[in-house]
């Protein structure tokens, strides 16, 4: 469907639920558009996603890809182990060296053009200026020599937003401008399209601001394909799930454990202790709900959980306490309850 769409249009939207294969689908669209030769750009909002896309495309490509990585973080090619709250994502090791040096990008693009074949620039939106300047240098010396056959905008909902009059565009919005980033085709893909209300659009127009909303075909093109979560479950592409909402209080903490917390024998407060008790109960499927509803499809306890914390410091603290607290909680239970707990 994208092949037919791109014969008449130069922009299109791909809406796919998480886990249904957006990255792989985009690869196949790119291969179809380039026929195994040419130049493509894959834009992502983070270094981690860049690495993920790079590895996925290099692994699944049917023809060899010459990758060029343009990343806004000069340290992206080496591992930073320490994490702090000012940088909530570890800078990962990239599968290929990254650069933000314009001359280096120009040289790599020129060499790729001379060699032929398929070249893909993997870049973060934040480094889009580097890509644009490299393109401009090459096109100035040889007009039209560096035009992307396809730009893939991953997490395209990040490219929406408002640009006020007389203010600079954000790096995420610049991708829409074909003068800034020349390309034959643009593919916008996301699981969560961001749309603005008619009221927001009217206010932006009154303020002479530019509003990028994903239902604007002039910016994003038509929606070519969509598969939501429900349809993906029906097609057995994704597993269905249930949401369990449970309430816990300090009364759910055994008295002996409460005493240890009160006396400062454990580095955890009552509130966090109650949350951990709730987590253990949920994993054990010990809740006051219909037993058949909860355990009927799968009577076994759950074995893993994801906990969200306010800061990295807190998450590290909780992670270090889980085993100790879990064991003390288990020891404080009666024998009948112990048999029900993971």
Each model region followed by its residue ranges:
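Pre-Walker A adenine-sensing motif
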Residues: 1-7, 292
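Pre-Walker A (Motif I) flank of P-loop NTPase domains
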Residues: 7-13, 38, 119, 301-304
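Walker A/P-loop
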Residues: 8-30
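Hydrophobic anchor at the beta1->P-loop junction of P-loop NTPases
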Residues: 14, 42, 307
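Conserved Walker A/P-loop ATP-binding site and its immediately adjacent core
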Residues: 37-62, 67-80, 125-127, 310-313
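Conserved helix/coil segment N-terminal to the catalytic DExD/H
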Residues: 103-147
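SF2 helicase catalytic motif II
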Residues: 126-127, 140-188, 193-194
């Amino acid at each position: 469907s994208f092949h037919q769409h791109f014969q008449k249009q130069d922009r299109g939207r791909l809406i796919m639920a998480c886990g249904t294969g957006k990255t792989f689908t985009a690869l196949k669209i790119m291969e179809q558009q380039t026929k195994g030769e040419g130049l493509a750009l894959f834009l992502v909002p983070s270094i981690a996603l860049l690495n993920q896309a790079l590895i996925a495309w290099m692994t699944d490509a049917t023809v060899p890809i010459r990758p060029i990585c343009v990343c806004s973080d000069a340290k992206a090619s080496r591992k930073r182990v320490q994490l702090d709250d000012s940088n909530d994502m570890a800078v990962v090791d990239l599968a290929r060296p990254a650069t933000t040096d314009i001359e280096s990008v120009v040289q790599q693009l020129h060499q790729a053009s001379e060699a032929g074949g398929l070249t893909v620039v993997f870049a973060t939106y934040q480094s889009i200026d580097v890509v644009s300047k490299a393109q401009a240098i090459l096109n100035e010396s040889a007009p039209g020599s560096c035009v992307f056959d396809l730009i893939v905008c991953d997490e395209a909902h990040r490219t929406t937003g408002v640009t006020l009059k007389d203010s600079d565009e954000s790096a995420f919005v610049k991708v829409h401008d074909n003068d800034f980033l020349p390309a034959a085709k643009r593919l916008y893909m996301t699981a969560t399209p961001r749309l603005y209300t008619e009221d927001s659009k009217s206010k932006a127009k009154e303020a002479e601001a530019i509003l990028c909303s994903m239902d604007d075909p002039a910016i994003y093109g038509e929606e070519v394909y969509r598969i939501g979560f429900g349809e993906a479950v029906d097609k057995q592409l994704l597993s269905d799930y249930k949401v369990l909402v449970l309430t816990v209080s300090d009364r759910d903490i055994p008295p002996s454990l409460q005493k240890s917390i009160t006396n400062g024998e454990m580095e955890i407060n009552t509130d966090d202790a109650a949350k951990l008790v709730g987590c253990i109960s949920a994993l054990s499927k010990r809740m006051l709900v219909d037993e058949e509803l909860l355990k009927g499809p799968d009577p076994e306890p759950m074995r893993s959980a994801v906990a969200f914390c306010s800061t990295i410091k807190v998450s590290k603290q909780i992670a270090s306490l889980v085993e100790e607290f879990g064991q003390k909680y288990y020891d404080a239970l009666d024998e009948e309850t112990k048999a029900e707990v993971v």
